[in-house]
Amino acid sequence: MLHIPHDSLQRGHRVREFVCTYRTLRDDQGQTVRVPTLALSDPRIAAATLAPLLANEAVEIFAVACLSTKHRLLAWYVLSRGTRSSTSISLPDVFVPACLTPGTTALLVVHNHPSGDPTPSPEDARLTLRLAQAADVLDLPLLDHLIVGDGGRYFSFREAGTLTAQIAGGVRV
């Protein structure tokens, strides 16, 4: 967790953006997790940073990362815990965290495949299309949809070129 000396706050200093090595988050079960505060613009870095938050899960977990203007992680929300082969999510649930997290200028969604194979299903592709369309309407860039598997394997809709190709006019990424 980032510590700001109390006397700094009393002097009226304003803090705009922090650059620190790690950010401490709590997962959906209350466990403390430390994640690097690297920019998550690159799918490889995003996968390496976020995959450990979903590692060793026996069921599909769907989460959203709220990102700053520099694509640094501001907040992490687990939105759904499903079964070994699926999870359900509603579109509004994905965008509510952006409203609750000051400074959010982009989103990155991620879910795991407990089978270990990050290959997207047809349902994953349809969901990504719907998310990208909604993000475009809300003028809130969807940076990527990552699917993480085992052994550091992942699938990035952005890297595959399908995130921007799915919508006429593209999604700003």
Please annotate each region the language model reported.
Residues Q29-R72:
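Glycine-enriched loop-and-adjacent helix/strand subsegments that border the catalytic/binding cleft
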Residues M1-D28, P36, I45-A48, K70, ...:
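Active-site-proximal loop/helix of nucleotide/amide-processing enzymes and allied scaffolds
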